[in-house]
């Protein structure tokens, strides 16, 4: 890594992608930029996605508003990458299984949180008269 950094002293996201990233990392970074411009959140899963996100954010800071860390990978460097992105993971299960497993596990939690934030009414907006009696009638109390 040190030799590579000496040969390629680029510090910007595009330069780092060009010097060290594969096509898949560049595609992820580009996809993150496109998603952010379309207002679509991106669920990150693992160290490679964190690296692509760091490059994408460096190229377009707006991307950071659309990133969600699905989990903290157990891969070395993951905590530092999430810290650099300013993200707290939804889950921290010590996973490093690959194949999108962290995102697959985190997705139901993210989806539920979104539904709760955007779909639930405040208690004052509900027409609740006697909630205890209603729950007793339903056999829930």
Give residue ranges: language-model regions:
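N-terminal loops that bind phosphate or other acidic moieties
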Residues: 1-141
